[in-house]
Amino acid sequence: MEEAGGPMARAKARVVSATLTWRQRPPTQEEIKHGFHKVSLVSGAQMEAPQKEMFEFSRREEVEVNGFATQEEETVNCQGPRDTAGSKNFQSHGPIFSKKYIPPPKEKRPEGRLKEAVDQSDGSRQAPRTEPPCVGAMARTELLVPLPGPREPSPHPGVGLTSGSSRSLEEYRVTRTVRTTTVVGGHVDRRMSSSVTVRPVSSGEALPRGRQVSRMVPPVVVGSPPGSPSRSQAVKVLSNLVPAGHSPPASHLPRPTAGGPRSTGLGSTVGAALRQLPETGTAELKDSSALASTGIPASAHLPKNQDAPAACPDRDQGRAPDARACELWQVLGAPSSTELPLQTSQGQASVPSSPRLETHVPSPGLTHPAKQPVVPTHPGARLTPLVLPPKKKDGPVDPPAATVLPMVRSEHVTVPGQPPAPSTTRRKDVPSPGGLSAPSSPRNKFVQNSENVPVLPFTQREVVKGPGAPAASSPTRKEVVQGSSASAASSPTWKEVVKGPGAPAASSPTQKEVVQGSSAPAALFPTWKEVVKGPGAPDASFPTWKEVVKGPGAPAASSPTQKEVVQGSGAPAALSTTPKEVVKGPGAPAASSPTQKEVVKGPCAPAASSPTQKEVVQGSGAPAALSPKSTEVVQGPKGSSSIQKEAVQGIAGSLAPPLTKEETVQGPIAPATSLPKQDKGVQDSEGSPISSLTQKEVVQDPDALPAPSSSVDRVSPSPGGTPAPVPTGAEASTESQLVSDPTEGKTCTETSREEDEVALAADLEIFLDTLRSMEPPEILRTHRLPRAPRSSYLSMYATLPAIEEDQLGPWVLGPGPQEVPSLEEKEEEEEEEPENPYLSDDEKLQRRQEKAGPSPSRDLHPARPTQVSCSPLEMMKKHVAGTKGPHSELGLELQGGSRPTSRLGGSLLFGSLVPTAKEASTPEPLGTKLSALLPHGAPGLRKVPGQLPLLCSERSSPTEKLACSLPLEGWSPALKTQGKLNTRPGKVIFFSESGCQGSGREVWGDIVDASGWAPVASIRVVRGCWVLYEEPEFRGQKLVLPEGDMELRTPGTKWSPQGIGSLRRVVWDYSTPEISLFSEEGLKGEQVKLTEALKNSQGLEKPLQVASATVSAGLWLLYPKPLFEDTPYILEPGEYPTSEAWGTSDPSVGSLKPMRLGCPSVEKPGEPRAVVYEAPGFQGRSWEVSRDIYNLQQPEDSQSPHLASVGSLRVLGGCWVGYEKEGFRGHQYLLEEGEYPDWSHWGGYDELLTSLRVIRTDFGDPAVVLFEAMDFEGHGVEVSKALPDVELVQHGPSTQAIHVLSGVWVAYQEVGFSGEQYVLEKGVYRNCEDWGAGNSTLASLQPVLQVGEHDLHFVSKIQLFSRPDFLGDHFSFEDDQAALPASFRPQSCRVHGGSWILFDETNFEGDQHILSEGEFPTLTAMGCLASTVLGSLQKVSLHFSEPSIFLYGLECFEGKEIELSREVRSLQAEGFNNHVLSVRIKGGIWVLCEHSDFRGRQWLVGSCEITNWLTYSGTQRVGSLYPIKQRRVYFRLWNAALGGFLAVPDHVEDMKAGRVVVADPQAGGSCIWYYEDGLLKNQMAPTMSLQVIGPPSPGSKVVLWAESRLPRQTWSISESGHICSQMFEGQILDVKGGRGYDRDHVVLWEPDEDRASQIWTIHVL
């Protein structure tokens, strides 16, 4: 034999190529031109009588890998029989490669092995070659050598006793010289060892296993010419490549048992050369008689490690394959006809598939062009492409015998008859009676098929092969499927280990999948594993996220949740996750996904029931392929493969055009049954069920019947194939249905069938019991976290476009996408849509009936247009071309993000239910206001601190709220036509002292001469815009008075005169201000017209020169400097022909602005009072009213005057609404406090004013939501400030529903607050008729504000009237009154601000009558008898604690206990006994009433303890009770010991937390606090509250934190001045003290009388 060595050049990955080829002729040019880097195994099937021949092999190899330089010289002399020339069909095996492997530390290596090991050459025990773990280690190698042992017979019927070849005459002569150079951290270590071994080979010995060397160069497979050495001889030579000094210790070597039947691997195997692949050793079978007894000749044993390398030295793993990408071909050897005649196919040609999706479709029997690597055609030849392996992926292969594979986490495997060895942490005991379970390396999967079905999963590529060439592929995992006598090859990523019959199960701790063939014992896999088991394999238990695929005779495996069980006699299934592609055929493995429970059973496997979300498919030949998401199912006659690059090969090896999305290819003899609703089961004649869920295409080989598919109706038949109809909308069910198998037992051997059935029956009962005891996965679904998306080497092209119909999010563990009806029902049950609270009971019932009834929009099977077919790579490229910015990563990458995704996103059925991008944002809080309502949801109830529950929904995004509701800069209502101008009354108050203090004078209109007034120090303009004149008759120097307060004596004021000459109101309506500026005098030259303020005229194209001007509307201020600086010139309406007319000779203008009216306002909302006059000008009869008047012309009582009309009126207090017609209908007019001399001043359309109504509500914190559709549907926007045009917030032009969240609003039909007025109070308005409009036009709106609302001063006041209905003489009190005037007998009263107690006697004695804020027109309304005479009154003190009261049935707080924290109208109605003898109040101030409904005698009780209620009140019962509700009170907390206020020194509005210290009032910061629902809040940060950070120990810091933090930390302020924590009992607020930097910080401390800093004084504003 001749030896050819490859070049020793170092690749980029520091790998030197080495070539070992087997041939008997000089290499051809085709072979030499490639840089071979492989170890080609050449084997032939023995078909005739053998002949003897001498063989000699010598080899010299020098390899340097990652710093290890190894030189080996070997000579092998073999003498033995050789098969007759011409009777061999040689098969070139794929290259055997491996990547650098770093062995685990010694203490973590697998234990529990047998004690003895026999060396392959000399029988001496060898230690594994390892390097100590250090930083400088360049590479590590460990040889894990399986022990020799007997082979088990194949259970397949095609394998029989075929003796005829013997190696008894062979002799091994091996001379090894190994030179090793190791570079570790700069240290060079050179070692050399030499050994010579001469020994005969017995017939029963197993062939040695080849040694693997780490390489990373493109391999090219060249077919061996005829006449090459026999396969067994090649195997012997390669097996001797293992150095003599590197066999592992005996403790690491497994000893196979002879109990369970194990089949040898039939056919050839291919392996993927990856990094971190262990160098496996060899094992020899010492006893050939064991094999002979099982029916397998000794010559039938194949090498245990035959790997085809798949390597590409491309560093950029993210790039897609290009022209330079290596093409990796893998040739699968077919078994000899004597071994398995059922799987031989004649005339198959190998057709390459390039990484660019170049698809060749040759006819049957077609061979390649000469330029491509050629593999000779012979029976059973199979061709499978290899794809680029990503970095850091492992792919060790598994031999038929047990192989010890290195692990990261050890798992203890127990063998029958051998005590388990002590195991370290994270180990699991796996009993394996049928064979020794060997741990596999992490993230590796081996698949061994029982029918010689190698399954090759590769990355993002698919080759579908004809008869006899099954291969399952998954785009993101490496799967290696081994047949009963064939090894498996693994693909670059996500390796899976699937083992065939006779192969022990491999236990993998994480991220592994194991598929076992017949007679293979099961392994235990903790998490994320998939197990495929063959016949005769005992069941395995899988905790979570597992998939079980079982062959014939394999008992069912139980898995608690998210399981898939696929059973079949022919071949186990290779399982892959999403996106999944499944290839199946008679005898081909099926792929299933881990998201649903699926049960696929073979002929010898009873049906296993799974609780929920299962799909059951039965078949005799192959298990079903079940893949809920992105599944591709390709079924060939004897197997097929699927990857996302698809090439479908026909019967004789022809290729079909590449398919896209999901495809289903069925081979001959593969009929498919239609899927029932919600359960899919497809069964072929060989028992090969197939299920394809969504967006699939069907490609069928000849004689294939239609296969079910859904969504995409496309058929791409291969040569001779018949198109299969693709039904749409096939649903999967939550209940499994078992499809019976008519051909059960066809592929099971007669000898093992009875034993398998017995074992299966027992295991099935255990499995069913386990399933019955499990909880349904719906319970666990909410506890699962989203699964992280897996990376792909195609990430540069983003991911595939999102599936348009019903794509589940990445965290959804529920049913598949076809389960539309079941999902609808579950969503309606679990996520029931909130009912619209605005609807009446009848409307709600009608809505429920509409939802329950059929609807055309609920059609689940609409017609779908066919989609253009293109490859996934092309779709991704198109997808990238049209994608920008952060949206380039779609699919799982996008779904795995922070934003929850919806499976309805691209749905044709439910796409309209998903809000658009701008509506999908999360609503932002608006302080105490409710957030805006989001679309497609009925408004719900939301609690607002200190307010009643308000109706709201989630409809608006932050961009649609107040942030964008403010008027845009440069907006002018003059651009649109205004309607009727609405006017406002005027009011100015002049004070004699600064700060608006002292005596005051109210002015309602123009004052021609005010020279006789007393000196004025400050002015408060309540309404309107006024001008002060220095002289009477509106002459002299002028001063503009806008709305607000102004000091006249301050240095900054430009008012020099000592007195006021005259006063005039210049702006009284909402007309648009307008001024025209001319460049020449006399109103000539270039004209510039303005309606808005101009901040800086220098920003114009040329300087603004103003020589004359005309003011058409409003009052304008012209400033000589930009930004409204310096003293302005005031221009009232009129013409100014020269600049001297407004007091200057300089024509330049720096800036100018108009004066506008503000929002409507009310000063005394709780004191409504108006005087109505019959004639204009306040003439004629008058009528003073303080209540609603239904009809002014027809009074309700006889005492009121009858007014024929209303000519004028004065509003003295409160906010009123006047109506044109009686009964509060017709045109509406807002009436503020002021004077209205005639109907034009209140903005009337005519003189009619028939009814009046008082607005009694809270004017603070206004907020309103506008909807474009009725019943609060459609687009909604929230507004909280005046809006001159609703289009500024992208709303309108139609408004058909309004929800006033708080405050009082005035809406206008036209822009600029003009046209018809509509007064809106807190509540909901379903349509425009509800607010009095005839159409839905609403163009502008503004709130009604309360004067002095933001002064934060708390005033509690009571008004007593001598007559009912607030008539007659009246007295107002703000303090306690021990005695009322003897001549004054109150008959009605009003309470403002707080609560008051009225006593029947003086000095606060007698019966109590507690009155909260409101109006009480009679004594009966006040809770008094008609004859009651009130003697004194007292104000209820403030409290700062949450209400809590305890009622006891016996004295001294004994007996039954009733705890309450809310009002109770009747204790008996609540089920309590109203007999009470003692009371304890822990918080709040309570009113206890003698009878129900707050009737009878009343007692006001604060925080106290009453040991005997009978003695205190004179009664033994409490009928009803309620806590006093207190309005918001602002206060300061004074610490007398430190001389400072509790303050927040920082601006915490935009901070997560704020410091809280004791500071001087002049130090800055905010020291104003308020108490709300138990929380202490600062006025500067209303969304934060006082909270303790850290453990509640003395000295823990107290800061301001978001009030949404849970649990809520509430506080109470006791009468003693302690601020107590309600959450941490016994802890109060204190100051740290000391001399540190944080000595002034507020902390938590235990009460201590010696610490005066714990006492706080409340200063109410």
UniProtKB/Swiss-Prot annotation:
GO terms for molecular function: carbohydrate binding. It comes from the Eukaryota. CDD domains: beta-trefoil_Ricin_CRYBG2. Residues 72-135, 148-168, 242-268, 297-321, 337-380, 411-757, 808-871, 883-903 are annotated as: Disordered. Residues 431-442, 706-719 have a biased composition (Low complexity). Pfam families: Crystall, Ricin_B_lectin. PROSITE patterns: CRYSTALLIN_BETA_GAMMA, RICIN_B_LECTIN. PANTHER family: BETA/GAMMA CRYSTALLIN, BETA_GAMMA CRYSTALLIN DOMAIN-CONTAINING PROTEIN 2. This is Beta/gamma crystallin domain-containing protein 2. The gene is CRYBG2.
